[in-house]
């Protein structure tokens, strides 16, 4: 089983590689089967149990769902760190969903540098501030392509080198 946190890391790696982004912020939430009002449809809220997986199983963890594209933003390292520390307030009600910060192994974020970052779970203010760009790359297609290289998948395989 690959945990929600590792699924968020997997999504971040796949989306960043597919879009050419420097890093990713992927919001997370547990899945509430009986109470969808607590859900975070903009983030990862599931787990992968074993390969091979169906498109339905992939979509269950993908913030982009069946058809949506990967979005990138341009933000300073300082702003990325702030977002990572505070989390995503999806409904502007003070309920914060944590972000998984995904970078290449050994990558250091410079506060003053500007980065291209994939964000799954961004407020309208962040979308405006970060000059959101639709990459034209469908999230499901990117994940299918990435997973096709594996016969099995475990948490130890989820690395960005």
Mark where each language-model region is:
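Catalytic centers of hydrolytic enzymes
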Residues: 1-161
């Amino acid at each position: 089983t690959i945990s929600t946190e590792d699924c968020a890391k997997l999504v971040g790696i796949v989306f960043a590689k597919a879009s050419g982004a420097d890093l990713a912020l992927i919001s997370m939430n547990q899945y509430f089967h009986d109470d969808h009002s607590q859900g975070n449809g903009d983030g990862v809220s599931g787990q992968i149990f074993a390969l091979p997986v169906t498109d339905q199983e992939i979509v269950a963890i993908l913030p982009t769902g069946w058809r949506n594209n990967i979005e990138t933003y341009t933000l300073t390292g300082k702003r990325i760190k702030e977002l990572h520390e505070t989390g995503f307030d999806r409904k502007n009600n003070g309920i914060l969903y944590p972000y998984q910060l995904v970078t290449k192994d050994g990558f250091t974020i410079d506060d003053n540098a500007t980065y291209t970052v994939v964000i799954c779970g961004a407020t309208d203010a962040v979308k405006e501030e970060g000059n959101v760009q639709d990459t034209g790359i469908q999230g499901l297609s990117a994940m299918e392509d990435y997973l096709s290289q594996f016969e099995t998948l475990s948490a130890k395989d989820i690395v960005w080198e």
